[in-house]
Amino acid sequence: MKVLFVNERGVRRLLTMNVCVPLMRDALTSLSRGEVVQPLRSLMRLPDGSGILGLMPGYLGEPRSFGLKVVTVMPGNHGTPYDSHQGVVMLFGVERGEPLAILDASSITAIRTAAASGAVTDALAREDAGDLALVGSGVQAGTHLAAMKEVRPLRRVRVWSRSRENAERFAREQSASAGVPIEISASAEEA
């Protein structure tokens, strides 16, 4: 058995936003055609309440593939060197069920979630839409900024976060890649 292992750096190198947005467009199209099997996630709570193990299987009809995302959610990890969400995505051969690959789930989730938003924005937003409001300043804010840049030319970006300090850090770190200044909003409504 030969299993490919792809860490976070490998995922980010291979699954770029310009690759993932069209993939998500295709996956959403397959979902609407009934070519996807995606049971509800299964959650197991640890008896002491310290965390959750989540299992999320799925099958895609085109290209035929299936796999499983296994993730832990450990709220006690906030403020430690460990992420609160960690896991892997496992892919299997459709014909024989053999394990093919184990990939870092955090990086896939960050990119895929935003790429789905990018695909939907591309399909539904006006061509001249260029204002972006981000509610939150974490990982998803950064990947959503990249996804929106992929599908629309941005003219204005506003961010609100529960922590103004985090919003300011996000604006500093992301302004160059945004191509426009990032404004800090005082409230989610203002953003």
Regions from the PLM with identified roles:
Residues 2-4, 156, 181-183:
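Conserved beta-strand segments of alpha/beta enzyme cores
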Residues 134-135, 160, 185:
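Structural motif
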Residues 1-110, 118, 128:
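N-terminal ligand-binding/catalytic initiation module
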Residues 112-133, 139-151:
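Short internal alpha-helix immediately C-terminal to a glycine-rich phosphate-binding loop
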Residues 3-6, 149-153:
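Acidic/polar active-site rim loop that often engages polyanionic ligands
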Residues 178-191:
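Short acidic low-complexity segments
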Residues 150-178:
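NAD(P)-binding Rossmann-fold cofactor-contacting core
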Residues 75, 137, 162:
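Cofactor-binding loop segments of dinucleotide-utilizing enzymes, especially the Rossmann-like FAD-
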